[in-house]
Design a protein with these regions (language model features):
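Mature N-terminal segment immediately following signal peptide/propeptide cleavage
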Residues: 74-97
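The feature marks the first
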Residues: 91-94, 109-120, 124-164, 168, ...
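Membrane-interface motif at the C-terminal end of an N-terminal transmembrane signal
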Residues: 40-54
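C-terminal structural cap/anchor segments
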Residues: 361-405, 411
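Flexible coil segments in periplasmic/lumen-exposed cytochrome c-class electron-transfer proteins
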Residues: 53-72, 97-117, 148-229, 233-234, ...
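N-terminal intrinsically disordered, acidic low-complexity segments at the extreme N-terminus
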Residues: 1-17
Length: 471
């Protein structure tokens, strides 16, 4: 049948032309599909949820409020204060500040393999910011991912989550932004190669990964649960880092909060699984972690999460943090295959005596640890004053050291820790300038073997890639 069909000749010139048209149509479709597939890879590169005021009172309930109260020209002090709190919850300052002397003025470069995105100015400057935006413009950007000029926004701006935020809350944020000092600053233009500079292609990404619509409270759940769900799914956009990506670089809805790696840092599993996730954490543990960035003897925030704590979650009310904890406890458990909890590994070192007086080898992990790390973490790895929030933490029973992947440990050695909260200032210096890739790998592998998960390790090549991942 196939052979006979292949020998059939067109009836005439018209039929030949029809075949050519069909072939061209198929080629166009295939080309468009190829462009979309390549473009989808770009979408994996999201802005960091990075980055001081007193902690604000709890905001209003989850349910939608009258959008008319958000008019910028008539914003009340209460509305502005509420908007500031919500802007903290959304960590707006993180991506929209490249220079602390001009907060919210944008210009933060987001480097990708396909070029660089620069975040926009969202101060009320009429020429370079959003001073000429109407409330409708702002709502459309937050809820639909469409800018004032009708351009489609890149999902580095998490409109896929912000679409769930009520109109009242969006307009409260708008009212707060209108009170900022206008900064006349034009961020650099995006430098993206074709076809990644074609914003209209976002239409296809949205078809697969975006559903517009506000948060709908679950009438069967408690007010606290609904409040936590509203924050986590909306303004806090936790899934952007903690949920793996599908082939289009949208979120894998079947693996929500199961953990993912971005820019070298691994955002851990935060489902209710008692081994792989945080199902064994108490509400007090979660509140402590989000407000102070640390659960003594268990976990400490570093990298992008440390910045989220410093610039966002530490300012949320205790009531809201408890609501987040209640909601996260209900997230379905997803196992990552771990046999033990990350915070149950390790034992104190006892080899320091044999190392005293010996010549330091450039790649001996134990010797390098004693020389570079023991002053703060003690040669036993048990830390100094490790029970206090701002102390030098123990490496034993430490969730970073006990993780299946050693990425975060190597990243901390390379890039350090800088976390400022109302509880304490935590600073660990970067060793990127002092240690070579093989030395960082040696220390990392010694620490995981002695104080953490002995099955976790990094290679020199992996360290080399991690070294530039956050630069």
């Amino acid at each position: 049948m196939t052979n006979k069909t292949s020998r059939v000749q067109p009836a005439g010139p018209g039929a030949q032309m029809q075949i050519q048209i069909q072939r061209r149509g198929r080629l166009r479709i295939a080309s468009l599909a190829a462009v979309f597939s390549v473009f989808a890879l770009y979408l994996a590169w999201h802005a960091s949820n990075d980055p001081d005021e007193q902690r604000e009172a709890s905001v209003t309930a989850v349910f939608a409020q009258d959008a008319s109260q958000g008019g910028a020209a008539f914003a009340s002090p209460g509305l502005v204060k509420r908007g500031e709190y919500l802007a903290r919850a959304g960590d707006c300052i993180a991506c929209h500040t490249s220079d602390r002397s001009r907060p919210f003025a944008g210009g933060l470069p987001i480097d990708t393999p396909f070029g660089t995105i620069y975040t926009p100015n969202i101060t009320p400057d009429p020429d370079t910011g959003i001073g000429r935006w109407t409330d409708a413009d702002f709502l459309r950007a937050m809820h639909e991912g469409i800018g004032k000029g009708g351009e489609r926004l890149y999902p580095a701006f998490p409109y896929a989550e912000y679409t769930r935020v009520t109109e009242g809350d969006v307009l409260a944020i708008r009212a707060y932004l209108n009170t900022l000092v206008p900064v006349h600053y034009t961020p650099p233009r995006n430098d993206l190669k074709f076809p990644f500079n074609q914003r209209w292609l976002m239409l296809f990404w949205n078809l697969f990964n975006f559903t517009e619509g506000r948060f709908v409270p679950d009438p069967k759940a408690s007010a606290q649960w609904n409040r936590g769900a509203y924050l986590v799914q909306g303004l806090a956009h936790c899934e952007e880092c903690h949920t793996p990506r599908n082939f289009t670089q949208g979120l894998k809805t079947s693996e929500r909060f199961a953990g993912a790696t971005q820019a070298g840092w691994h955002a851990f599993n935060i489902t209710s699984d008692k081994t792989s996730g945080i199902g064994n954490w108490s509400d007090a543990d979660m509140v402590s972690y989000l407000s102070a960035g640390v659960v003594p003897g268990r976990a400490g925030a570093a990298g992008p999460m440390a910045e989220v704590v410093a610039d966002s979650t530490q300012y949320l009310s205790t009531e809201d943090l408890r609501s987040v904890a209640i909601y996260m406890r209900s997230v379905p458990a997803i196992s990552g295959g771990e046999v033990r909890r990350r915070d149950t590994w390790g034992q104190p070192a006892n080899d320091v005596i044999s190392l005293r007086g010996t010549k330091i080898s450039g790649v001996n992990g134990a010797q390098l640890f004693v020389a570079n790390c023991a002053t703060c973490h003690h040669w036993t790895g048990q830390g100094i004053g490790a029970s206090a929030p701002g102390a030098y933490p123990s490496l034993i029973h430490n969730s970073t050291v006990g993780a299946v992947t050693a990425n975060n440990l190597a990243m901390v050695i390379l890039h350090g820790v800088n976390r400022t909260t109302k509880t304490a200032d935590v600073l660990m210096p970067s060793f990127a300038g002092e240690l070579t890739d093989d030395q960082v790998a040696a220390i990392t592998n010694y620490v995981t073997k002695q104080f953490g998960n002995p099955q976790s390790s990094v290679t020199v090549d992996q360290v080399a890639k991690l070294r530039v991942a956050q630069q």
